[in-house]
Amino acid sequence: MPRIKVFTRRQFAASAVSIAALAALPARSMANTSTQATGGNQMTTLTPYLLFDGNCHQAMEFYKSCFGGELTSMKVKDSPAKDHMPAVQQEKTINARLKSGSVEISASDWLRLDRPRIPGNTACLYLSGGTPQELKALFEKLSEEAEVHDPLKETFFGIYGALNDKFGVRWMFQAAKNS
C-alpha cells in the first residue's frame, strides 16, 4: 500500500480557506520535487493544484508575498513542450510551485485549448511522488466510473494522468520517470 501524506481536517481546511481567501519545479526540469524520503521509501503527497487564466505567475508571486517560501516557475517557452504548443501559449506558466514550511501550492495557467476553463475545473487534487507502480494503482482505483481526461503515460516530465472521479472531483497524478 502506498504511503500518502495525510493532513488533518483542520490543516486541509486551513489551506483551502487560505487559498480561497487569497484569491513546483526546479528551473531545469518538471521532475517531481514533492517526494519526501521516509526510511528509504518515497511518499506520495497530496497538494492543491490551481489553474489560472494567464495570470498564474502573478498569482503565485502574490501567494509568495503572503506565505513567504520558495517559488519555482516555468513558462511554456522554457520547457520541452514549447515545440508542441501554439505561439499564444508560449508566455504562459506551464508549472509553478510554492513551498513554505508545511504550505505547498502547485499551479499553472490553463493550457487546454480543447476544453473551456470554467468554475469547478480550475482546482484539483494533485497526487505526486511515490513510485510509478503506486501511482498506477491509485489511478486505477480512482478511475472506477470516472471521466479519464489523460490516461497515465510517460511525458517529458515523468508519468502523468488526469481524471474526474465518479463524484466529479478532479485529480492529477505525476511521478518521476523510471531511471
Feature locations, PLM:
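C-terminal segment of N-terminal export signals and the immediately downstream linker at the start
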Residues: A27-T44
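Twin-arginine (Tat) signal peptide motif
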Residues: I4-A13, A27-N32
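Core segments of cupin and vicinal oxygen chelate
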Residues: G40, L50-S102, Y160-A162
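Short, solvent-exposed beta-strand edge segments and adjacent coil->beta transition regions
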Residues: M43-T47, G120-C124
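N-terminal secretory signal peptides
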Residues: M1-F7, A16-A21
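Short beta->alpha transition motifs characteristic of CBS
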Residues: E154, F173-S179
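Conserved, structured core segments of small domains
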Residues: E104-S106
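Vicinal oxygen chelate
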Residues: C56, S65-C66, L111-I118, L125-K166
